[in-house]
């Protein structure tokens, strides 16, 4: 999944001092996934005491990677993350070098869920302009000490924030792995689909797989799956990832159909059985 760039169990890492940023916090969290010990040195500039550190990240205004040292920053001439209009940050540059390039699907999901949002946030770019979800690490800056706190505790607090970020990142990674595991099952269900209505025997993360299958065409229009509240849900299919625009709307009149307990936002309808849900979904598609 991720590889060490420096073959050591214990490494010294320099990041910038002052305010906490998701960029440098995420860098440390990522390194802690592959190194047993990560010693963090927070400085306002690289000096003779720190210039030989194993990693120098988000500070220094230079990129230089050797087998003994990794220096990555983004405050020099801006660079774009490949295939996007999002500017690089130190975390995106570090991830780019550490992630397994052959695990294409995992990389795609990780970039969409974590890397691109963190980079956009750090560079002051608007998430919505790029169809991105907000950064899952937006809490980082809010965790800094107040002016009345003992500033000697700043590094200790930084470590606490890194641990919080690690919990988030580990959960994102697990969610992605579980999502990838579901792809084959969703694909098999798509093969059996009839009339634009996809029926899942159990809830699975289906959105990405269905959007990819549709490829800009309304092949799958509605998805039915068991609800964790009992019964079955009908849900509309978004036209593209991160969009509320769908191929069709669920009309209010669906609430009058047999077995329906209600609908929400023209995007969901709730039924007591899969049979009633399928019957309703086919009617919705036919009448659209």
What are these regions (language model features)?
Residues 172-253:
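Acidic/histidine-rich
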Residues 116-205:
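Hydrophobic, aromatic-enriched interface-forming segments
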